[in-house]
Amino acid sequence: MNIKNVVVIGSGTMGSGIAAQLCNANVSVTLLDLKTEISEKAKKKILESKPPLLIDKSKIDNIKAGNIEDNFGTVEKADWVVEREVERINIKHNLYQKILKVRKKESIISSNTSTIPLKVLSEKMSHEDKKDFCITHFFNPVRYMALLEIVSEDINDVKKINFLKIFCEDSLGKGVIICKDTPGLLGNRVGVYA
């Protein structure tokens, strides 16, 4: 398995930050939102961000902007699809069904949420699809915050989760912890009491 092509759905602060960190690692990224103009605006914000999200401004060429209607076919070629949509479960469930219909079988699907439990996110998925689905909770700003929480279930393909962990450590420079499926995960819970 290898991660060379990633689709990030949702180009807000977190989605664009994840896309930027992936392109810093020379990964080809497609950044999708409701309209291509929104994704293009996110690319512009990445270039203008302070502190900079890119290690070199030329890295922005690794990101293609698009929309979830016209460019959804990019999901078919993605090694990893990262969902960063609004925290509304019905929207997420509908999006996952669309992703799961077209994605290549060996791909990883993840959500960047820390507020909705993995069991709730995956409740409408088949047994097979649940094996490839997890939470990858990045912190903002993605380039500078070292922590990444990965939440998986017993049903997950352990080899894929371990591969994703190593990829995020080695290629994205993250300190990865595997968390239980609890509200707020670990980082947010510790932060509340710090």
PLM region spans:
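NAD(P)+-binding Rossmann beta1-loop-alpha1 motif at the extreme N-terminus of oxidoreductases
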Residues: 1-49, 102
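Structural motif
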Residues: 9, 17, 66, 84, ...
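Amphipathic alpha-helical segments at domain termini/boundaries
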Residues: 20-24, 58-80, 163-173, 178-184
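Hydrophobic/aromatic residues located in beta-strands of well-ordered beta-sheets
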Residues: 29, 63, 81, 109-110, ...
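Rossmann-like dinucleotide-binding cores of NAD(P)H-dependent redox enzymes
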Residues: 31-57, 150-159, 176, 182-188
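Rossmann-like NAD(P)-binding element
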Residues: 34-41, 52-109, 115-120, 148
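Rossmann-fold dehydrogenase core element
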Residues: 106-111, 122-139, 174-175
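Internal alpha-helical scaffold of NAD(P)-dependent oxidoreductase catalytic cores
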Residues: 127-129, 147-182, 191-194
